[in-house]
From Swiss-Prot:
One of its GO terms (cellular component) is cilium. The gene is CIMIP1. PANTHER family: CHROMOSOME 20 ORF85 FAMILY MEMBER, SIMILAR TO PROTEIN C20ORF85 HOMOLOG. Expressed in airway epithelial cells, renal tubular cells, pancreatic acinar cells and epithelial cells of the stomach, duodenum, and gallbladder (at protein level). It is found in: Cell projection, Cilium. InterPro entries: C20orf85-like (IPR020339). Keywords: Cell projection. This is Ciliary microtubule inner protein 1. The keyword Lipid metabolism does not apply. It comes from Homo sapiens.
Length: 137
């Protein structure tokens, strides 16, 4: 009788030479990592007290260097020197008590009452051009 063909996974399990090479490669990588660990990660084994010992020593203050006058920062100019804030005018009397409505003082509404007649603009431009009425509507 004929045997069933081996699957890929079964064939890989039977490849002992390939498995041995993979095992050697893994062992070599592990030994290299073990040798390189102190160089890359050795600072993690340093005791905490030794690490903070350097921080406890206060650094010596740097000598202050006098800058020439042209490099010094000028003092801040107060805002009141270049911005003048005058008191607000009194709130005008209005019919509704709000700013923006028509004033209750009769003389202040003149500019609002100039165009009290409502005019229709429909056809005004056409009349200036002397168009016939059929073209307006």
């Amino acid at each position: 009788m004929a045997q069933k063909p081996l699957s890929t996974a079964a064939a890989e399990r039977m490849n002992l030479v390939g498995q041995d090479e993979i095992w050697k490669y893994r062992l070599k990588a592990e030994s290299e990592a073990r040798q390189n660990w102190p160089q890359n990660w050795g600072f993690l084994t340093t005791p905490f007290e030794e690490l903070i010992k350097c921080e406890e020593d206060l650094p010596t203050p740097k000598p202050k260097i006098e800058l020439p006058e042209r490099f010094r920062i000028r003092p801040v100019t107060p805002v009141e020197k270049y911005i003048k804030v005058f008191p607000s005018p009194p709130v005008p009397q209005t019919t509704q008590g709000f700013i923006g409505w028509r004033s209750a003082v009769p003389g202040l509404n003149k500019c609002l009452e100039l165009d009290d007649a409502i005019r229709s603009c429909k056809g005004a431009f056409a009349r200036e051009l002397c168009w016939p009425k059929q073209g307006v509507h």
